[in-house]
């Protein structure tokens, strides 16, 4: 549904960007995504490499980044783009991958796993993300202009490991149905976070085992 992404990610984003321009807001942080890299052949993906989105969602995020870059250039705005890599954690959207997994494993519902579970993701715990954003907001002076960061742990985890981790915590087995690879899906995400660590001095990323346990305990899924 390309129109849905255009209405939300492009038109909605443009409305906010215009408000930032008109109100002369000092710092504008916006959400981008690891999907801008598409199925990269080079890992870990760096902020400076060529972007090749594989789906409409990723394409809209590239458009937003370029829009922010031009607004920064022509209207002297300070825009900071955050390329989030598979953020998960307590109180997450129920339609996202990990919350759906937790719910379906708990109630023994059928889980559709694409590409035989061979996907790999750079999972980033939500509390880490909150701390990073706080540090970035506090750090940057008014002269930042436009800058982009990979917001990622820098660690790659196989989807099957996530499933096994949830099974272990909940002490339940999953009901898996393996399906073929979906169009536009990325086989792997793995970001380089050197720039992020340098500018925030944040290095204590939550590992997937701890993140899953905290998510389940805080959401009282057991």
Listing of model-derived features with the role each one plays in the protein:
Residues 26-27, 78-80, 147:
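Structural signature of beta-strand start/N-cap positions in the alpha/beta core
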Residues 14-56:
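Conserved Rossmann-fold NAD(P)-dependent oxidoreductase catalytic core, especially the SDR/UDP-sugar
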């Amino acid at each position: 549904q390309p129109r849905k992404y255009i209405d939300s990610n492009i038109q909605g984003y443009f409305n906010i960007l215009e408000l930032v321009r008109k109100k002369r807001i000092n710092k504008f942080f916006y959400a981008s995504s690891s999907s801008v890299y598409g199925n990269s052949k080079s890992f870990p993906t760096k902020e400076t490499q060529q972007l090749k989105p594989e789906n409409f969602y990723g394409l809209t995020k590239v458009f937003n980044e370029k829009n922010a870059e031009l607004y920064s250039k022509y209207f002297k705005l300070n825009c900071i783009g955050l390329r989030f890599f598979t953020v998960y954690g307590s109180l997450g959207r129920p339609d996202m991958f990990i919350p759906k997994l937790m719910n379906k494993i708990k109630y023994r519902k059928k889980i559709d796993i694409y590409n035989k579970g061979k996907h790999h993701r750079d999972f980033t715990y939500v509390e880490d993300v909150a701390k990073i954003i706080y540090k970035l907001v506090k750090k940057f002076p008014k002269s930042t202009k436009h800058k982009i960061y990979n917001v990622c742990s820098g660690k790659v985890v196989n989807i099957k490991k996530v499933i096994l981790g949830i099974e272990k915590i909940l002490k339940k087995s999953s009901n898996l149905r393996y399906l073929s690879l979906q169009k536009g899906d990325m086989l792997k995400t793995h970001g380089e976070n050197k720039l992020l660590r340098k500018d925030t001095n944040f290095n204590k990323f939550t590992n997937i085992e701890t993140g899953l346990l905290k998510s389940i305990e805080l959401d009282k899924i057991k």
